[in-house]
């Protein structure tokens, strides 16, 4: 198996310096400025003057989706290997998420969960470097358990962003990873029970025979397509910790170096070949050292259409608070998909964070920083958004 803790190097890019002021406890305004692509600077309206003592309470930090505490604990432990977590953020997200893959968190991460229509489990994962704006990702990875480690190898050993399917497996094998079945007795039993229920629910639309009554095989209907939302509601699928979900993690050191990581085994009973939002840049996660980062979780087929993580980071770039940014990422989706279920966590480069969710009562997430060690926090979800039906064409 390949080495999993890599030595760090200056090639990760020049990190922003810690915000300090030797003459006073009060932070000077300049570090709070965010430089735009044209070189002008604006101070986000939500950032008040922070004291040096307050800054020490925010960074370094690790935050991740859902109540996946052992992943958070592992990442936090790795950040502690250097003062202020410096140069450990990549190791932290990769090994923190790997811990969840090993534990098969809620059967929604790692091997042995979310069987597709053929009973096979496949994995999606991503790592993003917010300094170099570099990404490595895999989608539909077969027969390799360490999905996020393979994504790291894509980042560090190729010029590509995303490798998929059996070819991603072939790449992993060439890099020294070992193959093994991702099917377990539990996942096989779940698949058998699904088939015994006439393959309900499934992901087929506008086909014959009726996918609500049959396992197929299917052929396209000869009639004009109906609007997808009129044909089937998203809430037929129970989305949450146990299905159709992701661990998304953000790590920031005291020099404001940011990495994000994601991993999932995707949607249960998906059509083979389906890739969700987790390995898609701007959907599953996004990071920019100059601004902050965001991760998303939930109904990936819908979420990737809106790039909520990118949307949240760009909102913070334009002066929104982490809370406003996270809510914007959610509300943009709910405007069009009232049955959507999902959540977004947003963190600015100073370590201030917030979460927003929709379609479920509440959303738990994990945080570790100098004042909260492996602490679970919960946010109440946004209320139902009434959407007027679109006029029929």
From Swiss-Prot:
Regions of compositional bias (Polar residues) in chain numbering: 19-41
Keywords linked to the UniProt accession: Autocatalytic cleavage, Disulfide bond, Hydrolase, Protease, Signal
EC number: 3.5.1.26
Swiss-Prot/TrEMBL catalytic activity: N(4)-(beta-N-acetyl-D-glucosaminyl)-L-asparagine + H2O = N-acetyl-beta-D-glucosaminylamine + L-aspartate + H(+)
The protein's enzyme class: hydrolase
InterPro entries according to UniProt: Ntn_hydrolases_N (IPR029055), Peptidase_T2 (IPR000246)
Post-translational modification: Cleaved into an alpha and beta chain by autocatalysis; this activates the enzyme. The N-terminal residue of the beta subunit is responsible for the nucleophile hydrolase activity.
Cystines in this chain: 100-105, 199-215, 357-381
Start and end residues of each stretch annotated as Disordered: 15-41
Positions of substrate binding: 274-277, 297-300
UniProt record, GO biological process: protein deglycosylation; proteolysis
Active site: 246 (nucleophile)
Gene Ontology terms for molecular function: N4-(beta-N-acetylglucosaminyl)-L-asparaginase activity; peptidase activity
Record-level GO cellular component terms: lysosome
One Pfam family from the record: Asparaginase_2
SUPFAM superfamilies xref list: N-terminal nucleophile aminohydrolases (Ntn hydrolases)
Family designation: Belongs to the Ntn-hydrolase family.
Matches recorded under PANTHER family: L-ASPARAGINASE (PTHR10188), N(4)-(BETA-N-ACETYLGLUCOSAMINYL)-L-ASPARAGINASE (PTHR10188:SF6)
Function of the molecule: Cleaves the GlcNAc-Asn bond which joins oligosaccharides to the peptide of asparagine-linked glycoproteins.
Protein name from the UniProt record: Putative N(4)-(beta-N-acetylglucosaminyl)-L-asparaginase GH22932
Organism: Drosophila grimshawi
């Amino acid at each position: 198996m390949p080495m999993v803790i890599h030595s760090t190097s200056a090639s990760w890019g020049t990190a922003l310096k810690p915000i300090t002021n030797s003459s006073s406890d009060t932070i000077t305004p300049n570090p709070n400025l965010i430089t735009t692509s044209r070189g002008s600077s604006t101070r986000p309206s939500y950032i008040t003057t922070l004291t040096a003592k307050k800054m020490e309470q925010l960074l370094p930090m690790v935050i991740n989706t859902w109540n996946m505490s052992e992943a958070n604990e592992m990442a936090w432990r790795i950040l502690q290997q250097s003062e202020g977590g410096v140069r450990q953020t990549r190791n932290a997200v990769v090994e923190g998420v790997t811990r969840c893959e090993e534990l098969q968190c809620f059967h929604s991460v790692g091997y042995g969960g979310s069987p597709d229509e053929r009973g096979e489990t496949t994995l999606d994962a991503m790592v993003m470097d917010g300094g170099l704006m570099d990404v490595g990702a895999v989608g539909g990875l077969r027969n390799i358990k360490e999905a996020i480690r393979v994504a790291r190898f894509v980042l560090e050993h190729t010029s590509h962003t995303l490798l998929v399917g059996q070819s991603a497996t072939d790449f992993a094998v060439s890099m020294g990873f070992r193959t093994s079945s991702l099917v377990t007795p539990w996942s096989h039993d779940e698949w058998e029970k699904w088939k015994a229920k006439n393959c309900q629910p499934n992901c087929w639309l506008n086909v014959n025979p009726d996918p609500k009554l049959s396992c197929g095989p299917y052929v396209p209907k000869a009639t004009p397509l109906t609007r997808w939302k009129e044909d089937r509601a998203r809430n037929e699928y129970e989305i949450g910790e146990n299905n159709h979900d992701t661990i998304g993690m953000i790590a920031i050191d005291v020099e404001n170096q940011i990495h994000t990581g994601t991993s999932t085994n995707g949607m249960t009973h998906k059509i083979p070949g389906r890739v969700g939002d987790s390995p898609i840049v701007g959907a599953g996660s996004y990071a920019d050292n100059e601004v902050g980062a965001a991760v998303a979780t939930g109904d990936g087929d819908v979420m990737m259409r809106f790039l909520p993580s990118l949307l949240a980071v760009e909102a913070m770039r334009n002066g929104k608070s982490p809370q406003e940014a996270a809510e914007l990422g959610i509300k943009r989706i709910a405007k069009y998909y009232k049955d959507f279920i999902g959540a977004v966590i947003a963190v600015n480069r100073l370590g201030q964070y917030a979460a927003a969710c929709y379609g479920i009562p509440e959303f738990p997430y994990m945080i570790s920083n100098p004042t909260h060690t492996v602490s679970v926090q919960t946010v109440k979800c946004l209320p139902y958004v009434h959407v007027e039906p679109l006029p029929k064409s």
